[in-house]
Design a protein with these regions (language model features):
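Phosphate/dinucleotide-binding and metal-coordinating scaffold of catalytic cores
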Residues: 1-262, 266-268, 280-385
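Conserved protein-kinase catalytic-loop segment immediately C-terminal to the catalytic Asp
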Residues: 273, 278-280
Length: 385
């Protein structure tokens, strides 16, 4: 960082100082130097942070908008930021996230967690609109008011506060006739989870944001409980290593993992990855408290299936056979190895499964919905017999 102006920043948990580092956040060189670790507060360091300069940099990068997010370039350009300066994004949005209560405080800022946190303070509706649509004018505002900068995932999305609660609005993919059905799958997958008794986030459908169909779900984190994706706790070894890790946490965690594998086999979830399941952390103690509820099921229930499938059983069956899980080899093999007696009871409830068409004004065409229902029933039979 020779010849550049380095600034000191402190990673805080609420207002508790944890680690101070020095970096030039506007430089292409992301080199940073740890100045101090507050040993008396070490137990409150993020569980997914390795105390090293590379580890701090990785942790910071996890708190920036992903490069594959829809409209990411439009959003950043409107506020004068660049994907090529990820630490610059951190400096601008203070590393705030709706996943937890950590943040990055610049030396001498005078800020407090109460003043800047995303759980209590207003969001920028202008930035939310740009994040969701890609359209909008360049603006000058505090980026600390925009949770979109630290939200993962590639689909267009934004957060809104309504009646004292925080909701995530998420759109679908676009451009081709077989795309854009992810919001439906989010809602219908929740219905399957309800019948099975699996702990999953409730999704509804709405067009109250720019008249675009999108899914809507309530935030499941808070100032009391935060979320850590399992991939930030178990970095290698795949599902085998994750099972072993969950066994160290207790039976409740193993049960949740087994439920997830059976559920994903039923809904044919091709996008379960190490970033969209994990654990909840008690923010008072900074210790793992419970498995996180399941969420992010837009790439399930054949949401990418072409229009030629829904009146052609043979074509649909051939298509369904091509769909594979992302994080392990085979849906049914993984589910059967995880199954316990309780799962048989869950699966029996699906043998005559039907979606609740009265739950929303927005449903898939009847032929498509009927085909998916039949496949849910079939997949339950495969696991039972």
């Amino acid at each position: 960082m020779k010849g550049e102006i380095a600034v000191r920043y402190t990673i805080r948990h609420f207002d508790l100082p944890l680690l101070t580092f020095e970096a030039n956040m506007d430089s292409a060189d992301t080199d940073l130097h740890i100045i101090k670790v507050y040993e008396e507060n070490r137990s409150f360091l993020p569980l997914n942070l390795t105390v090293s300069e590379d580890g701090v940099e990785r942790w910071l990068r996890h708190r920036t908008i992903p490069k594959n997010r829809a409209y990411v370039d439009a959003l950043l350009s409107k506020v004068g930021l660049s994907l090529n300066r990820p630490l610059g994004i951190i400096a601008a949005n203070k590393g705030l996230s709706l996943n937890d209560c950590f943040w990055v405080d610049a030396e001498g800022s005078g800020d407090t967690f109460e003043k800047v946190n995303l759980y209590d303070n207003r969001f920028s509706q202008v930035l939310a609109a740009i994040a969701f649509t890609g359209y909008g004018s360049s603006i000058r505002t505090s980026l600390a008011s925009c949770p979109e900068f630290s939200t993962n995932g590639m689909l267009p999305k934004c957060w809104r506060r309504q009646n004292g609660k925080i909701y995530l609005y998420k759109g679908g993919t676009s451009r081709f006739s077989n795309l854009g059905f992810e919001p439906y799958s989010e809602m219908y997958a929740y219905q399957v989870a309800q019948v099975m008794g699996v702990n999953a986030i409730r999704y509804t459908l709405t067009k109250d944001l720019k008249k675009t169909l999108c899914s809507k779900c309530e935030l499941f984190t808070s100032k009391e409980y935060s979320y850590i994706p399992i991939g930030q706790l178990v970095s290698k070894g795949g599902m085998k290593a994750i099972f072993e890790y969950y066994q160290t946490l207790g039976r409740t965690f193993v049960d949740a993992l087994e439920d997830m594998l059976v559920f994903d086999a039923i809904i044919c979830n091709t996008d379960r990855h190490y970033g969209n399941f994990g654990v909840l952390v008690d923010n008072k103690t900074n210790t793992i408290a419970a498995p996180a509820p399941l969420f992010d099921h837009g790439n399930s229930l054949f949401s990418l299936g072409g229009t030629d499938l829904w009146d052609n059983q043979k074509a649909f069956d051939e298509y369904a056979r091509t769909l594979l899980p992302l994080a392990y080899d085979d849906f049914f093999a993984a589910a059967k190895s995880a199954m316990k007696p309780r799962h048989r009871a869950m699966l029996h409830k699906l043998l005559d499964f039907h979606f609740d068409r009265r739950a929303t004004r927005y449903n898939l065409p009847p032929n498509r919905l009927k085909m998916i229902e039949k496949e849910v029933q079939r997949r339950a039979r495969v696991l039972l017999w």
